Amino acid sequence: MRSRNQGGESSSNGHVSCPKPSIISSDGGKGPSEDAKKNKANRKGEDDVMASGTVKRHLKPSGESEKKTKKPLELSKEDLIQLLSIMEGELQAREDVIHMLKTEKTKPEVLEAHYGSAEPEKVLRVLHRDAILAQEKSIGEDVYEKPISELDRLEEKQKETYRRMLEQLLLAEKCHRRTVYELENEKHKHTDYMNKSDDFTNLLEQERERLKKLLEQEKAYQARKEKENAKRLNKLRDELVKLKSFALMLVDERQMHIEQLGLQSQKVQDLTQKLREEEEKLKAITYKSKEDRQKLLKLEVDFEHKASRFSQEHEEMNAKLANQESHNRQLRLKLVGLSQRIEELEETNKSLQKAEEELQELRDKIAKGECGNSSLMAEVESLRKRVLEMEGKDEEITKTEAQCRELKKKLQEEEHHSKELRLEVEKLQKRMSELEKLEEAFSRSKSECTQLHLNLEKEKNLTKDLLNELEVVKSRVKELECSESRLEKVELSLKDDLTKLKSFTVMLVDERKNMMEKIKQEERKVDGLNKNFKVEQGKVMDVTEKLIEESKKLLKLKSEMEEKVYSLTKERDELMGKLRSEEERSCELSCSVDLLKKRLDGIEEVEREINRGRLCKGSEFTCPEDNKIRELTLEIERLKKRLQQLEVVEGDLMKTEDEYDQLEQKFRTEQDKANFLSQQLEEIKHQMAKNKAIEKGEAVSQEAELRHRFRMEEAKSRDLQAEVQALKEKIHELMNKEDQLSQLQVDYSVLQQRFMEEETKNKNMGREVLNLTKELELSKRYSRALRPSGNGRRMVDVPVASTGVQTEAVCGDAAEEETPAVFIRKSFQEENHIMSNLRQVGLKKPMERSSVLDRYPPAANELTMRKSWIPWMRKRENGPSAPQEKGPRPNQGTGHPGELVLAPKQGQPLHIRVTPDHENSTATLEITSPTSEEFFSSTTVIPTLGNQKPRITIIPSPNVMSQKPKSADPTLGPERAMSPVTITTISREKSPEGGRGAFADRPASPIQIMTVSTSAAPPEIAVSPDSQEVPMGRTILKVTPEKQTVPTPMRKYNANANIITTEDNKIHIHLGSQFKRSPGPAAAEGVSPVITVRPVNVTAEKEVSTGTVLRSPRNHLSSRPGANKVTSTITITPVTTSSTRGTQSVSGQDGSSQRPTPTRIPMSKGMKAGKPVVAAPGAGNLTKFQPRAETQSMKIELKKSAASSTASLGGGKG
């Protein structure tokens, strides 16, 4: 239904293009079309500058339609076709109207789901309609899905934390109830103990009264005992008289026993004499047996020594015999060989003798003169020689005969030696037989010795029996003597016993008194220990109460933190609402501007350019707004991290509660020990009761048991003292833990202060968001200035400034202190410091829980990436560049300045300036920043360019002829073409020993020029320099970072190579003919356009960034006629770089952990006025900086493609 050949234009990005209806009218209708053509000619340069992905189409109006006659009735075929196209345009317009009416019926709920708000309904409907036409987005997308899922996740997290808090509160309540219950138990036990102690004191008083009564009884008992003792004395005197008569009888018996003893003593003397004789005999026999044993031992040792020596000698002799036999065999073999040789020599002797005889005969013949031939003389000479040889052999024969004789002598000697050895072996065998006989004799003597030992033992037993009988007799005599002494001692002992009994009773009374006093002292000590224990128990209770209060405070702090996070999220939502309202305002303004332009122009071409301008502006608007949204989302993520760290603090509180449980367990153990002590006291009381029962019995047993009990009590008191000491030590430990808790409180107060500081920083953030809104308004004013006016020109002639993408932040020490990210990083570091102090104090964390820094690293890396798109930072950094952008552009050709239009990414403004030099056919590309201090401060574009020399491999492709144009104007002709060369260069880091050739000693460069493809230029290029303009293609540069290497200043030159690397770190790449060093004016055949990429200032210690520069320049250079071959040179010259990179760059290279956020940076033109910025003719530049975490290599992909006349509907692709 639609014809796209002349009517509409479809964009690669999906933007709507309006149809172009032809205007057929009379002379009055011809004027607007001519005005449109003029506007088109004036804005031809601007048509080339588009966003990335747009497709340029050159629409050629038919000549017949312009030269149309005024005859309305006689219509030609072309007129009919034109009418048909008008009808199609009207149909297209009708369809658009139908579509607009449909979109007006869309519900506000759909718009809210798609755009996030339904407030400016008309604007959103228009946007919805354009989106459906362009098919930019899927209609089913819902903006609220992701935030709702995040909200649900937050609610789940909140529920979980609430449940955990409830568990903690329940645990605390349980602990509190348990402690209250234990305190009540302790009170009851204390009252029971006091009652028991009162009962015990009453018992002791009763015991004292009982002991007094016992003393009185003892006194009466002593008086009675004295009377009984007097009676016993009388009885004992009577017994003494009887004992004296009994002693006389014993004396008589004693005399009889003495006589018997005299007889027995004579017998004993005889027996002793016999014993002495027997003992002497035994001594003599034992002495002989000892001597025999020693002799036997010596003989055995000698025998063993000789046997071992003989065995060794026998083995040696056998070995010698074997050696001699083998030697004899060898000598015999030699003799056989020599005898054969002697036979051979004898045969030769015989032959020699024959030869001598023949010689003699010949000599005789010669002397007689019978034979005078020369042949005979030769034979004679040969025979002489042979004779001489034979004589030499005779000498050898004599030598061999002498050797044979010597060998015979040696054989005889060896035979003689072997006979001697055999004789020695026979002698040894005889000696062995003698030794065996000696062994038999030794065995006999051993058996005799054993018999003698047995006899000796029998004699010893007899003597022992006799001695025993003597001892029995002596003991009987001694017993008789002892009986007399005993009778005398009994009287003395009875008297002593009486005195001892009296003194012992007195001692028992004294000991009882001492025991009572000691028992009272022990009871006092036990009471003191109980009091101390209760005091320590009270301290433990205080500590537990403090712990509970601390946990409550921490819970309150948590709730306050959550409320603050909630308020922050609310503020973020409000800011998002403000942003949306600002976006709606911007959309309304753009719509009103579009309506004004439609009313002013009324022509489709102007309308198309307005749409293009709107697209460009839309890309420029979205960048800062996307920046703000991303910044707010990053703030939300940081707050979430903060919440996680607070959860870590909550885990530490749980640990303190675990320690509180351990203290409670220790308290229970101490209570058990106290109960054990009370049980021991009860046992003591029980034993005292037993002692009272024993006192009623015998006095002696009572006193012994009392002493035993007293010792037991002393031992128990020592044990009690040791336990008291242990209790004191534990109490000291508890006090130390209380000190640790106070330290925790101090750290907690520090954390509160940090939190207050964070609140102030958040307020500062709110102020900075207001600055953001102001900057939005400024950007809107700037976009109004960029819109084209009625004559097709822009309201303000904007300088050549492009927005490059740079993902690394710019360093600024003064500005770094003011950013919220720096504050959050510092607060994280301080919290980590506090936690490490806590761990040093003694609260050790478990091994499975990693540190806070490992789980939540500081935001330093994010800071380095985010810094360049923080708006208040960007205002300061880009301040000096604003006046430079509005200045005139130096060194510019006749055409419009080359403009670089960028993709809508974030970044700091860089300025790429292209300056052509028509005399030398060169072009210079310069990349600068607003100020030299800030340029490349985060190593943005080419971070490691300066101190490294690249290694570039060039692969030329075969020449490609320029295509013939399908339709071309007669004025254009292919007079100038570009060299069809494809360059593929690979540069990687190489070790010095791995390099070869001209690049052996030079380190690898981080720059890789992947492909440089230059094709033939279209015929439109080769026109006169004054009248025609050159359409430009695109050049794509891909730069990825690589590691730096230490530079070695070298100068390499190869005559056959197209690359020369010089000491000034310049890389000259030749596309076509050989490189020429002469800087003179170039000839028409070999002119070389040069692209110079010159980074002005590169500073160190920042992360390598990625960037994209998309450039479709409308800088039209006039080309020279007659140049059929062009030599292109790319010179990449780093001015200054630094040699080091900081530690923060490591994390930036890790692609898995962090993704570097790109920043949008406008580039000013004017740091160095002498280095004008450039694009080579026929190419537009697209620079892509891509980070690689693994290879860290840098690629520069250069593609040159010139648009030919055949590709009228599409441009070159980067």
Swiss-Prot record:
Sorted keywords for this record are:
Coiled coil, Cytoplasm, Cytoskeleton, Phosphoprotein
Spell out the InterPro entries in the cross-references.
Answer: Cortactin-Actin_Reg (IPR050719), Cortactin-binding_p2_N (IPR019131)
Gene Ontology cellular component terms for the protein in this record: actin cytoskeleton; cytoplasm; glutamatergic synapse; nucleolus; plasma membrane
The answer to whether UniProt assigns keyword Cytoplasm to this entry is yes
Residue positions where Phosphoserine is found in the record? 138, 979
* Name the record gives this protein: Filamin-A-interacting protein 1
| Low complexity: compositionally biased ranges | 1126-1140, 1169-1180
Q: Does the keyword Coiled coil apply?
A: yes
This chain's function reads:
By acting through a filamin-A/F-actin axis, it controls the start of neocortical cell migration from the ventricular zone. May be able to induce the degradation of filamin-A.
Record field: compositional bias (Polar residues): 1-15, 1141-1157
Organism field: Mus musculus
Compositional bias (Basic and acidic residues) at which positions?
Answer: 32-47, 61-73
Instruction: Fetch the PANTHER family from UniProt.
Output: FILAMIN-A-INTERACTING PROTEIN 1 (PTHR23166:SF3), FILAMIN/GPBP-INTERACTING PROTEIN (PTHR23166)
Name a biological process GO annotation: neuron migration
Encoding gene, per UniProt annotation: Filip1
